[in-house]
Design a protein with these regions (language model features):
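Intrinsically disordered, low-complexity, charged terminal extensions of DNA damage-control enzymes
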Residues: 29-82, 243-258
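Alpha-helical ds-nucleic-acid-binding substructure associated with the helix-hairpin-helix region
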Residues: 63, 67, 95-96, 100-174, ...
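Alpha-helical scaffold segments that form or flank carboxylate-/histidine-based iron centers
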Residues: 79-94
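Short, positively charged low-complexity motifs
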Residues: 1-3, 15-21, 32
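A basic, often C-terminal nucleic-acid-binding module that engages the phosphate backbone, implemented
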Residues: 209-258
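Catalytic DNA-binding helix-loop module of base-excision-repair DNA glycosylases/AP lyases
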Residues: 162-207
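Short helix-capping/linker segments at secondary-structure and domain boundaries
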Residues: 94-102, 149-153, 189-194, 241-249
Protein backbone atom coordinates (compact mmCIF):
# COMPACT_ATOMS: atom_id res chain seq x y z
CA UNK A 1 0.00 0.00 0.00
CA UNK A 2 1.43 3.37 -0.99
CA UNK A 3 2.62 5.60 1.82
CA UNK A 4 -0.09 8.25 1.66
CA UNK A 5 -2.82 5.64 2.11
CA UNK A 6 -1.59 4.82 5.61
CA UNK A 7 -4.11 6.31 8.05
CA UNK A 8 -4.01 6.71 11.80
CA UNK A 9 -7.37 5.27 12.78
CA UNK A 10 -8.88 7.22 15.68
CA UNK A 11 -12.35 6.68 17.06
CA UNK A 12 -14.17 9.78 18.21
CA UNK A 13 -14.02 8.66 21.83
CA UNK A 14 -10.23 8.32 21.62
CA UNK A 15 -9.91 11.83 20.19
CA UNK A 16 -12.04 13.18 23.00
CA UNK A 17 -9.93 11.35 25.59
CA UNK A 18 -6.74 12.79 24.09
CA UNK A 19 -7.70 16.45 23.85
CA UNK A 20 -10.95 16.84 25.75
CA UNK A 21 -9.24 17.81 29.00
CA UNK A 22 -7.53 20.78 27.36
CA UNK A 23 -9.99 23.71 26.95
CA UNK A 24 -8.02 25.28 24.09
CA UNK A 25 -7.66 22.05 22.14
CA UNK A 26 -11.28 21.12 22.83
CA UNK A 27 -12.51 24.42 21.41
CA UNK A 28 -10.36 24.41 18.28
CA UNK A 29 -9.04 21.00 17.25
CA UNK A 30 -11.69 18.63 18.57
CA UNK A 31 -14.69 19.88 16.54
CA UNK A 32 -12.80 19.55 13.25
CA UNK A 33 -10.85 16.38 14.01
CA UNK A 34 -13.69 14.47 15.63
CA UNK A 35 -16.01 15.42 12.76
CA UNK A 36 -13.57 13.95 10.26
CA UNK A 37 -13.03 10.84 12.37
CA UNK A 38 -16.80 10.51 12.86
CA UNK A 39 -17.45 10.56 9.13
CA UNK A 40 -14.49 8.65 7.72
CA UNK A 41 -12.82 6.72 10.51
CA UNK A 42 -9.29 8.05 10.05
CA UNK A 43 -7.07 11.08 10.22
CA UNK A 44 -7.21 12.97 6.94
CA UNK A 45 -4.72 12.49 4.14
CA UNK A 46 -4.30 14.60 1.04
CA UNK A 47 -3.86 13.92 -2.66
CA UNK A 48 -0.13 13.87 -3.29
CA UNK A 49 1.22 16.23 -5.95
CA UNK A 50 3.54 19.21 -6.17
CA UNK A 51 5.82 21.30 -8.35
CA UNK A 52 6.55 18.49 -10.80
CA UNK A 53 2.91 18.08 -11.78
CA UNK A 54 2.11 21.79 -11.69
CA UNK A 55 5.10 22.79 -13.80
CA UNK A 56 4.18 20.15 -16.37
CA UNK A 57 0.61 21.45 -16.65
CA UNK A 58 1.75 25.08 -16.83
CA UNK A 59 4.06 24.27 -19.72
CA UNK A 60 1.30 22.41 -21.53
CA UNK A 61 -1.41 25.06 -21.18
CA UNK A 62 -0.97 28.83 -20.74
CA UNK A 63 -4.57 29.41 -19.66
CA UNK A 64 -4.42 26.70 -17.05
CA UNK A 65 -1.04 28.08 -15.97
CA UNK A 66 -2.67 31.42 -15.16
CA UNK A 67 -5.26 29.70 -12.97
CA UNK A 68 -2.59 27.65 -11.19
CA UNK A 69 -0.55 30.79 -10.50
CA UNK A 70 -3.56 32.51 -8.93
CA UNK A 71 -4.85 29.54 -6.97
CA UNK A 72 -1.58 28.03 -5.79
CA UNK A 73 -1.56 24.46 -4.52
CA UNK A 74 -5.09 23.13 -3.97
CA UNK A 75 -5.31 20.53 -1.23
CA UNK A 76 -7.86 17.78 -1.75
CA UNK A 77 -8.59 15.20 0.91
CA UNK A 78 -8.17 11.48 0.29
CA UNK A 79 -10.55 8.81 1.61
CA UNK A 80 -8.43 5.66 1.29
CA UNK A 81 -11.02 3.21 2.62
CA UNK A 82 -12.82 2.44 -0.64
CA UNK A 83 -15.61 0.53 1.07
CA UNK A 84 -16.49 3.46 3.34
CA UNK A 85 -16.21 5.89 0.43
CA UNK A 86 -18.57 3.84 -1.74
CA UNK A 87 -21.12 3.47 1.05
CA UNK A 88 -20.93 7.22 1.63
CA UNK A 89 -21.45 7.86 -2.09
CA UNK A 90 -24.50 5.61 -2.24
CA UNK A 91 -25.98 7.18 0.89
CA UNK A 92 -25.57 10.69 -0.52
CA UNK A 93 -27.04 10.15 -3.97
CA UNK A 94 -29.75 12.61 -5.05
CA UNK A 95 -30.06 14.37 -1.68
CA UNK A 96 -28.74 17.68 -0.40
CA UNK A 97 -25.44 17.99 1.43
CA UNK A 98 -27.31 18.83 4.65
CA UNK A 99 -29.57 15.80 4.32
CA UNK A 100 -26.59 13.59 3.56
CA UNK A 101 -24.80 14.75 6.71
CA UNK A 102 -27.88 13.95 8.79
CA UNK A 103 -28.32 10.49 7.26
CA UNK A 104 -24.63 9.68 7.63
CA UNK A 105 -24.60 10.74 11.28
CA UNK A 106 -27.49 8.43 12.12
CA UNK A 107 -25.92 5.68 10.01
CA UNK A 108 -22.65 5.95 11.96
CA UNK A 109 -24.53 5.89 15.26
CA UNK A 110 -26.35 2.72 14.19
CA UNK A 111 -23.06 1.01 13.37
CA UNK A 112 -21.28 2.20 16.48
CA UNK A 113 -18.91 4.40 14.49
CA UNK A 114 -17.39 1.60 12.39
CA UNK A 115 -18.46 1.38 8.73
CA UNK A 116 -17.34 -2.14 7.92
CA UNK A 117 -18.88 -4.95 5.87
CA UNK A 118 -19.32 -6.94 9.09
CA UNK A 119 -21.14 -4.11 10.87
CA UNK A 120 -23.49 -3.53 7.93
CA UNK A 121 -24.16 -7.25 7.56
CA UNK A 122 -25.23 -7.35 11.21
CA UNK A 123 -28.05 -4.81 10.78
CA UNK A 124 -31.29 -5.13 8.84
CA UNK A 125 -32.49 -3.16 5.84
CA UNK A 126 -35.26 -1.81 8.07
CA UNK A 127 -32.66 -0.44 10.48
CA UNK A 128 -30.81 1.19 7.59
CA UNK A 129 -34.02 2.79 6.37
CA UNK A 130 -34.48 4.13 9.89
CA UNK A 131 -31.35 6.21 9.33
CA UNK A 132 -33.06 7.99 6.45
CA UNK A 133 -31.78 5.79 3.64
CA UNK A 134 -34.23 4.89 0.89
CA UNK A 135 -35.17 1.25 0.49
CA UNK A 136 -33.11 1.02 -2.68
CA UNK A 137 -30.02 2.50 -1.03
CA UNK A 138 -30.38 0.15 1.92
CA UNK A 139 -30.44 -2.82 -0.46
CA UNK A 140 -27.41 -1.55 -2.38
CA UNK A 141 -25.37 -1.02 0.78
CA UNK A 142 -26.27 -4.46 2.14
CA UNK A 143 -25.33 -6.07 -1.18
CA UNK A 144 -22.01 -4.25 -1.26
CA UNK A 145 -21.15 -5.50 2.23
CA UNK A 146 -22.13 -9.04 1.28
CA UNK A 147 -19.97 -8.98 -1.86
CA UNK A 148 -16.95 -7.96 0.19
CA UNK A 149 -17.62 -10.61 2.83
CA UNK A 150 -18.14 -13.28 0.17
CA UNK A 151 -14.89 -12.36 -1.55
CA UNK A 152 -16.66 -11.30 -4.75
CA UNK A 153 -14.75 -8.02 -4.78
CA UNK A 154 -11.30 -7.27 -3.39
CA UNK A 155 -10.59 -3.57 -3.04
CA UNK A 156 -7.02 -4.37 -2.05
CA UNK A 157 -6.38 -5.64 -5.58
CA UNK A 158 -7.23 -2.24 -7.11
CA UNK A 159 -3.77 -0.82 -6.40
CA UNK A 160 -2.27 -3.07 -9.09
CA UNK A 161 -5.05 -2.48 -11.64
CA UNK A 162 -5.24 0.07 -14.46
CA UNK A 163 -7.77 2.89 -14.18
CA UNK A 164 -10.18 1.40 -16.70
CA UNK A 165 -9.99 -1.99 -15.01
CA UNK A 166 -10.96 -0.44 -11.68
CA UNK A 167 -13.86 1.41 -13.31
CA UNK A 168 -15.05 -1.82 -14.95
CA UNK A 169 -15.09 -3.58 -11.58
CA UNK A 170 -16.81 -0.77 -9.71
CA UNK A 171 -19.65 -0.20 -12.16
CA UNK A 172 -20.67 -3.83 -11.73
CA UNK A 173 -21.81 -2.87 -8.24
CA UNK A 174 -25.40 -1.77 -7.64
CA UNK A 175 -25.69 2.00 -7.30
CA UNK A 176 -22.22 2.75 -8.70
CA UNK A 177 -21.92 4.53 -12.05
CA UNK A 178 -18.89 5.68 -14.00
CA UNK A 179 -18.71 9.11 -12.33
CA UNK A 180 -18.66 7.56 -8.85
CA UNK A 181 -16.01 5.09 -10.01
CA UNK A 182 -13.87 7.93 -11.37
CA UNK A 183 -14.15 9.81 -8.08
CA UNK A 184 -12.93 6.69 -6.26
CA UNK A 185 -9.90 6.61 -8.53
CA UNK A 186 -9.03 10.18 -7.60
CA UNK A 187 -10.06 10.45 -3.97
CA UNK A 188 -9.51 6.89 -2.71
CA UNK A 189 -6.71 5.55 -4.90
CA UNK A 190 -4.94 8.83 -5.59
CA UNK A 191 -4.81 8.24 -9.35
CA UNK A 192 -3.36 11.23 -11.18
CA UNK A 193 -4.79 11.00 -14.68
CA UNK A 194 -8.59 11.26 -14.37
CA UNK A 195 -10.72 13.89 -16.14
CA UNK A 196 -14.38 13.04 -15.66
CA UNK A 197 -16.49 13.97 -18.68
CA UNK A 198 -19.61 13.11 -16.67
CA UNK A 199 -18.82 15.75 -14.05
CA UNK A 200 -20.87 18.90 -14.68
CA UNK A 201 -18.41 21.10 -12.79
CA UNK A 202 -15.51 19.83 -14.90
CA UNK A 203 -17.44 20.75 -18.03
CA UNK A 204 -18.24 24.19 -16.61
CA UNK A 205 -14.60 24.71 -15.71
CA UNK A 206 -13.53 23.84 -19.25
CA UNK A 207 -16.14 26.21 -20.67
CA UNK A 208 -14.98 29.06 -18.49
CA UNK A 209 -11.29 28.45 -19.14
CA UNK A 210 -11.46 28.02 -22.89
CA UNK A 211 -14.66 29.79 -23.93
CA UNK A 212 -16.52 26.79 -25.32
CA UNK A 213 -20.32 26.84 -25.35
CA UNK A 214 -20.50 23.06 -25.10
CA UNK A 215 -18.05 20.37 -24.06
CA UNK A 216 -18.38 17.32 -26.25
CA UNK A 217 -16.82 13.97 -25.41
CA UNK A 218 -14.31 14.42 -28.22
CA UNK A 219 -13.32 17.84 -26.86
CA UNK A 220 -12.96 16.51 -23.31
CA UNK A 221 -10.76 13.69 -24.59
CA UNK A 222 -8.48 16.20 -26.31
CA UNK A 223 -8.05 18.14 -23.08
CA UNK A 224 -7.48 14.90 -21.20
CA UNK A 225 -4.69 14.08 -23.62
CA UNK A 226 -3.19 17.54 -23.13
CA UNK A 227 -3.24 17.24 -19.34
CA UNK A 228 -2.06 13.61 -19.29
CA UNK A 229 -0.54 12.14 -17.15
CA UNK A 230 -1.77 14.67 -14.57
CA UNK A 231 -5.42 15.20 -15.53
CA UNK A 232 -6.60 14.69 -11.94
CA UNK A 233 -4.47 17.64 -10.85
CA UNK A 234 -5.88 19.74 -13.70
CA UNK A 235 -9.35 18.71 -12.50
CA UNK A 236 -8.74 20.38 -9.13
CA UNK A 237 -8.27 23.71 -10.90
CA UNK A 238 -11.24 23.19 -13.21
CA UNK A 239 -13.42 22.52 -10.16
CA UNK A 240 -12.06 25.66 -8.50
CA UNK A 241 -12.92 27.68 -11.61
CA UNK A 242 -16.42 26.22 -11.84
CA UNK A 243 -17.07 26.93 -8.16
CA UNK A 244 -15.81 30.51 -8.37
CA UNK A 245 -12.98 29.79 -5.94
CA UNK A 246 -10.39 31.48 -8.16
CA UNK A 247 -10.67 34.64 -10.24
CA UNK A 248 -9.93 34.23 -13.92
CA UNK A 249 -10.49 36.57 -16.82
CA UNK A 250 -10.42 34.67 -20.08
CA UNK A 251 -8.62 36.33 -23.00
CA UNK A 252 -11.08 38.25 -25.19
CA UNK A 253 -11.12 36.09 -28.23
CA UNK A 254 -13.07 33.20 -29.66
CA UNK A 255 -13.07 29.82 -28.00
CA UNK A 256 -9.77 28.01 -28.14
CA UNK A 257 -9.37 25.70 -31.10
CA UNK A 258 -7.54 22.49 -30.38
Amino acid sequence: MVEWFKALVLKTSEVQASVGSNPTLSATILPRLSRRVFYYGSAMLYFEYGEKELNYLKKKDKRLAAVIEKAGVIQRELYPDIFVSLVNSIAGQQISRHAKASVWRRFMELLGGAVTPQAIDAVTEEQLRGCGLSGRKAVYIKRLAQKVLNGEIDFGAFAAMADEEVIAELIKLDGIGKWTAEMQLIFSLGRKNILSFGDAAIQNGLKRLYGHKKITLALAEKYHKRYSPYASVASFYLWALANGDVEYERPRRNAEKI
